[in-house]
Design a protein with these regions (language model features):
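FIC/Doc superfamily catalytic core
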Residues: 1-198
């Protein structure tokens, strides 16, 4: 598979076309919205099928013959739809703590079962797998330092991977950090003419 080269005018045109399509063509926007919501939430353990996500997006409801469905799964997908709308509306702004916290607010505000702060950094220590994450009192400082370093870098695929890795290691939120990290990757790829990935 050919690697995209941003210095190549054909590749730059392709990335610009993808961004333009996402912003101006409902069909492209709808496809990315549904596919990204499904894939990103599936990675985090959401059990909805793509067809159920598509139905929720298109009609606001899901009919199921498979039995019960968790309210949390529905709320997470609906939250992702809101976060993606917010993402598209902020493409002209540099990445900031406010945008990151707004992603979390969009993702988690519809989940009435969520007992953690919504739109705010974590208040309690958490462990991801066997990895110790940053303590709650250090999160804001660590995120600010990460954003400051990132703002000074030439953004390419490698710097996006580095940013995502550091963001995951900080693990700024009690729940939803992985989904937010993937939203950031998609957003920053679009902002920097890097073909986005879903």
């Amino acid at each position: 598979m050919k690697k995209l080269d941003r210095s190549n005018s054909d590749d730059a045109k392709l990335c610009a076309l993808l961004k333009e399509s996402l912003l101006n063509e409902k069909e492209a926007y709808d496809y990315v919205q549904k596919t990204m919501a499904y894939n990103s939430n599936f990675i985090d353990g959401n059990f909805l099928t793509f067809e159920q996500v598509e139905s929720l997006y298109n009609t606001g409801s899901i009919s199921t013959r498979e039995g019960s469905m968790q309210a949390k799964s529905l709320a997470e997908i609906q939250g992702h739809f809101s976060a993606f709308n917010y993402l598209v509306g902020t493409l002209d702004e540099p990445l900031s703590e406010e945008i990151i916290k707004a992603f979390h607010y969009c993702l988690k505000t519809k989940n009435h079962l969520n007992k953690s702060p919504v739109g705010e950094y974590k208040k309690f220590v958490n462990i991801v797998g066997e990895m110790q994450t940053v303590s709650p009192v250090e999160v804001s400082t660590e995120v600010k330092e990460l954003l400051e370093r990132y703002s000074k870098e030439k953004v390419d695929l490698d710097s996006l991977v580095d940013f995502h890795t550091e963001f995951e290691m900080i693990h700024a939120f009690h729940d939803g950090t992985g989904v937010i990290g993937r939203l950031i990757l998609f957003r920053e790829a679009l902002r920097n003419d890097i073909c986005p990935f879903i």
